[in-house]
Protein backbone atom coordinates (compact mmCIF):
# COMPACT_ATOMS: atom_id res chain seq x y z
CA UNK A 1 0.00 0.00 0.00
CA UNK A 2 1.29 3.46 -0.97
CA UNK A 3 1.73 5.88 1.92
CA UNK A 4 1.40 9.66 1.77
CA UNK A 5 5.17 10.00 2.07
CA UNK A 6 5.56 8.10 -1.23
CA UNK A 7 3.73 10.90 -3.05
CA UNK A 8 6.04 13.69 -4.15
CA UNK A 9 3.18 15.76 -5.63
CA UNK A 10 -0.46 15.86 -4.53
CA UNK A 11 -3.46 18.02 -5.34
CA UNK A 12 -6.71 18.30 -3.41
CA UNK A 13 -9.77 19.64 -5.21
CA UNK A 14 -7.65 21.59 -7.72
CA UNK A 15 -9.96 23.89 -9.68
CA UNK A 16 -9.55 26.70 -12.23
CA UNK A 17 -12.52 28.84 -13.23
CA UNK A 18 -12.06 31.34 -16.09
CA UNK A 19 -15.02 33.68 -15.47
CA UNK A 20 -17.59 30.92 -15.53
CA UNK A 21 -15.73 28.41 -17.70
CA UNK A 22 -14.37 25.67 -15.45
CA UNK A 23 -11.22 24.38 -17.17
CA UNK A 24 -10.11 22.18 -14.26
CA UNK A 25 -12.61 20.89 -11.69
CA UNK A 26 -11.81 19.25 -8.34
CA UNK A 27 -8.77 17.32 -9.56
CA UNK A 28 -7.15 15.06 -6.96
CA UNK A 29 -3.75 13.93 -8.19
CA UNK A 30 -1.19 11.66 -6.50
CA UNK A 31 2.23 11.30 -8.13
CA UNK A 32 4.48 8.64 -6.62
CA UNK A 33 8.17 9.28 -6.12
CA UNK A 34 10.42 7.97 -8.91
CA UNK A 35 7.49 7.04 -11.12
CA UNK A 36 6.45 8.12 -14.62
CA UNK A 37 2.91 9.51 -14.40
CA UNK A 38 1.09 10.52 -17.58
CA UNK A 39 -1.75 13.01 -17.92
CA UNK A 40 -3.84 12.28 -21.00
CA UNK A 41 -7.21 13.19 -22.46
CA UNK A 42 -8.93 14.53 -25.57
CA UNK A 43 -8.29 18.08 -26.78
CA UNK A 44 -9.73 20.59 -24.33
CA UNK A 45 -9.63 18.13 -21.43
CA UNK A 46 -7.71 20.56 -19.20
CA UNK A 47 -4.25 18.99 -19.35
CA UNK A 48 -2.31 22.16 -20.14
CA UNK A 49 -4.29 24.21 -17.62
CA UNK A 50 -3.53 21.56 -15.00
CA UNK A 51 0.19 21.78 -15.83
CA UNK A 52 0.06 25.57 -15.57
CA UNK A 53 -1.57 25.29 -12.16
CA UNK A 54 1.02 22.81 -10.88
CA UNK A 55 3.93 25.00 -11.96
CA UNK A 56 2.18 28.13 -10.69
CA UNK A 57 1.87 29.94 -14.02
CA UNK A 58 -1.84 30.04 -13.19
CA UNK A 59 -3.41 30.65 -9.80
CA UNK A 60 -5.99 28.05 -8.72
CA UNK A 61 -9.55 29.20 -8.11
CA UNK A 62 -9.82 26.54 -5.41
CA UNK A 63 -7.93 23.58 -4.03
CA UNK A 64 -4.47 22.84 -2.72
CA UNK A 65 -1.13 21.74 -4.21
CA UNK A 66 1.39 19.89 -2.03
CA UNK A 67 4.96 19.21 -3.11
CA UNK A 68 6.97 16.92 -0.81
CA UNK A 69 4.35 17.64 1.84
CA UNK A 70 4.75 21.43 1.55
CA UNK A 71 1.81 23.61 0.53
CA UNK A 72 2.96 25.44 -2.63
CA UNK A 73 -0.50 26.69 -3.68
CA UNK A 74 0.36 30.36 -3.16
CA UNK A 75 4.03 30.21 -4.17
CA UNK A 76 5.58 31.95 -7.19
CA UNK A 77 6.83 29.85 -10.16
CA UNK A 78 10.50 30.65 -9.49
CA UNK A 79 10.18 29.60 -5.86
CA UNK A 80 8.53 26.32 -6.85
CA UNK A 81 11.34 25.65 -9.34
CA UNK A 82 13.92 26.26 -6.63
CA UNK A 83 12.23 23.56 -4.54
CA UNK A 84 12.94 21.08 -7.33
CA UNK A 85 9.66 21.07 -9.30
CA UNK A 86 10.76 22.02 -12.82
CA UNK A 87 8.83 22.13 -16.08
CA UNK A 88 10.39 21.48 -19.47
CA UNK A 89 9.33 21.83 -23.11
CA UNK A 90 6.66 24.52 -22.76
CA UNK A 91 9.15 26.75 -24.57
CA UNK A 92 12.47 25.92 -26.18
CA UNK A 93 15.04 25.79 -23.42
CA UNK A 94 18.08 26.08 -25.68
CA UNK A 95 19.96 28.87 -27.41
CA UNK A 96 20.29 27.80 -31.07
CA UNK A 97 23.71 29.32 -31.76
CA UNK A 98 25.39 28.11 -28.58
CA UNK A 99 26.94 24.65 -28.48
CA UNK A 100 25.41 21.86 -26.43
CA UNK A 101 28.09 22.36 -23.77
CA UNK A 102 27.52 26.12 -23.66
CA UNK A 103 23.75 25.66 -23.32
CA UNK A 104 24.15 23.40 -20.30
CA UNK A 105 26.75 25.73 -18.77
CA UNK A 106 24.35 28.66 -19.03
CA UNK A 107 21.65 26.59 -17.29
CA UNK A 108 24.12 25.71 -14.52
CA UNK A 109 25.06 29.37 -14.27
CA UNK A 110 21.40 30.29 -13.83
CA UNK A 111 20.93 27.63 -11.15
CA UNK A 112 23.96 28.81 -9.16
CA UNK A 113 23.20 32.51 -9.49
CA UNK A 114 26.34 33.37 -11.46
CA UNK A 115 26.45 36.49 -13.63
CA UNK A 116 24.83 36.48 -17.07
CA UNK A 117 27.42 39.00 -18.30
CA UNK A 118 28.50 36.92 -21.29
CA UNK A 119 31.48 39.06 -22.28
CA UNK A 120 33.04 38.85 -18.82
CA UNK A 121 31.80 35.52 -17.49
CA UNK A 122 33.94 32.98 -19.40
CA UNK A 123 36.01 32.24 -16.30
CA UNK A 124 32.85 31.75 -14.27
CA UNK A 125 31.29 29.51 -16.91
CA UNK A 126 34.44 27.41 -17.26
CA UNK A 127 33.97 26.31 -13.64
CA UNK A 128 30.83 24.48 -14.74
CA UNK A 129 32.43 22.55 -17.61
CA UNK A 130 32.85 19.31 -15.68
CA UNK A 131 29.26 19.16 -14.50
CA UNK A 132 27.99 20.19 -17.96
CA UNK A 133 29.87 17.29 -19.56
CA UNK A 134 28.41 14.90 -16.96
CA UNK A 135 24.89 16.03 -17.83
CA UNK A 136 25.54 15.71 -21.57
CA UNK A 137 26.79 12.19 -20.94
CA UNK A 138 23.62 11.42 -18.93
CA UNK A 139 21.45 12.27 -21.95
CA UNK A 140 23.72 10.62 -24.53
CA UNK A 141 25.14 13.80 -26.06
CA UNK A 142 28.82 13.61 -25.08
CA UNK A 143 30.00 13.52 -28.69
CA UNK A 144 27.89 16.59 -29.53
CA UNK A 145 29.32 18.84 -26.80
CA UNK A 146 30.83 21.25 -29.34
CA UNK A 147 27.93 21.14 -31.81
CA UNK A 148 25.72 24.26 -32.04
CA UNK A 149 22.13 23.45 -31.10
CA UNK A 150 20.88 24.76 -34.45
CA UNK A 151 22.82 21.98 -36.22
CA UNK A 152 21.43 19.17 -34.06
CA UNK A 153 18.67 16.77 -35.09
CA UNK A 154 15.29 17.37 -33.48
CA UNK A 155 15.50 14.44 -31.08
CA UNK A 156 18.95 15.54 -29.92
CA UNK A 157 17.62 19.05 -29.28
CA UNK A 158 14.99 17.48 -27.03
CA UNK A 159 17.72 15.55 -25.23
CA UNK A 160 19.63 18.83 -24.82
CA UNK A 161 16.52 20.46 -23.37
CA UNK A 162 16.34 17.64 -20.83
CA UNK A 163 20.02 18.21 -19.98
CA UNK A 164 19.39 21.93 -19.39
CA UNK A 165 16.41 21.02 -17.21
CA UNK A 166 18.54 18.56 -15.21
CA UNK A 167 21.05 21.38 -14.71
CA UNK A 168 18.40 23.11 -12.59
CA UNK A 169 18.74 20.22 -10.12
CA UNK A 170 15.10 19.05 -10.14
CA UNK A 171 13.62 16.29 -8.05
CA UNK A 172 10.53 16.20 -10.23
CA UNK A 173 10.22 17.06 -13.91
CA UNK A 174 7.03 18.04 -15.71
CA UNK A 175 7.36 17.27 -19.41
CA UNK A 176 4.92 19.06 -21.71
CA UNK A 177 4.41 16.96 -24.86
CA UNK A 178 8.03 15.75 -25.08
CA UNK A 179 7.39 13.83 -28.32
CA UNK A 180 5.69 16.68 -30.22
CA UNK A 181 6.87 16.98 -33.81
CA UNK A 182 9.17 13.94 -33.74
CA UNK A 183 9.67 11.09 -36.17
CA UNK A 184 9.68 7.46 -35.03
CA UNK A 185 13.46 7.23 -34.58
CA UNK A 186 13.61 10.35 -32.40
CA UNK A 187 10.57 9.22 -30.39
CA UNK A 188 12.28 5.93 -29.55
CA UNK A 189 15.48 7.70 -28.46
CA UNK A 190 13.76 10.29 -26.27
CA UNK A 191 11.41 7.70 -24.77
CA UNK A 192 14.44 5.60 -23.80
CA UNK A 193 16.06 8.69 -22.28
CA UNK A 194 12.96 9.52 -20.21
CA UNK A 195 12.80 5.93 -18.98
CA UNK A 196 16.47 6.07 -18.00
CA UNK A 197 16.28 9.33 -16.04
CA UNK A 198 13.14 8.19 -14.21
CA UNK A 199 15.41 6.06 -12.01
CA UNK A 200 16.60 9.30 -10.38
CA UNK A 201 13.71 11.71 -10.98
CA UNK A 202 9.93 11.72 -10.72
CA UNK A 203 8.28 12.43 -14.09
CA UNK A 204 4.82 13.87 -14.79
CA UNK A 205 4.11 14.30 -18.48
CA UNK A 206 1.39 15.39 -20.84
CA UNK A 207 1.72 13.29 -23.98
CA UNK A 208 -0.59 12.69 -26.95
CA UNK A 209 1.30 9.68 -28.31
CA UNK A 210 -0.54 6.80 -26.67
CA UNK A 211 2.10 4.25 -27.68
CA UNK A 212 4.65 6.25 -25.71
CA UNK A 213 2.23 6.55 -22.79
CA UNK A 214 1.60 2.80 -22.84
CA UNK A 215 5.29 1.91 -22.90
CA UNK A 216 6.58 4.46 -20.38
CA UNK A 217 3.94 5.20 -17.78
CA UNK A 218 3.55 3.56 -14.40
CA UNK A 219 0.31 5.45 -13.76
CA UNK A 220 -2.02 7.30 -16.13
CA UNK A 221 -4.63 9.90 -15.21
CA UNK A 222 -7.32 10.49 -17.83
CA UNK A 223 -8.89 13.95 -17.88
CA UNK A 224 -12.05 14.92 -19.71
CA UNK A 225 -13.84 18.26 -19.47
CA UNK A 226 -11.47 19.29 -16.70
CA UNK A 227 -12.23 16.34 -14.43
CA UNK A 228 -10.51 13.05 -13.65
CA UNK A 229 -12.35 10.36 -15.59
CA UNK A 230 -10.16 7.40 -14.66
CA UNK A 231 -6.74 6.47 -13.32
CA UNK A 232 -4.61 3.36 -13.44
CA UNK A 233 -2.15 1.51 -15.65
CA UNK A 234 -2.49 1.35 -19.42
CA UNK A 235 -3.65 -2.27 -19.52
CA UNK A 236 -6.61 -1.52 -17.27
CA UNK A 237 -7.50 1.84 -18.80
CA UNK A 238 -7.45 0.49 -22.35
CA UNK A 239 -10.37 -1.77 -21.36
CA UNK A 240 -12.33 1.00 -19.60
CA UNK A 241 -15.45 1.82 -21.61
CA UNK A 242 -15.55 5.37 -20.21
CA UNK A 243 -12.03 6.02 -21.50
CA UNK A 244 -12.85 4.53 -24.90
CA UNK A 245 -15.93 6.74 -25.14
CA UNK A 246 -13.96 9.86 -24.19
CA UNK A 247 -11.52 9.25 -27.05
CA UNK A 248 -14.04 7.94 -29.59
CA UNK A 249 -14.26 10.50 -32.35
CA UNK A 250 -12.30 13.02 -30.28
CA UNK A 251 -8.93 14.30 -31.44
CA UNK A 252 -6.09 13.63 -29.09
CA UNK A 253 -3.08 14.10 -31.38
Where are these regions (language model features)?
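Glycine-rich phosphate-binding loops of nucleotide-dependent enzymes
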Residues: 2-253
Amino acid sequence: MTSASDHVLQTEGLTKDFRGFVAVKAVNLRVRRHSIHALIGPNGAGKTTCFNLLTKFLKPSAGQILYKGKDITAMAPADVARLGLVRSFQISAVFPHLTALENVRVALQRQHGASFDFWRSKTVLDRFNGRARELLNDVGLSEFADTPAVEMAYGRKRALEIATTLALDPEMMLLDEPMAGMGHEDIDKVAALIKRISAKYTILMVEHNLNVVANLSDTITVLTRGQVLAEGNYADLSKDERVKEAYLGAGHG
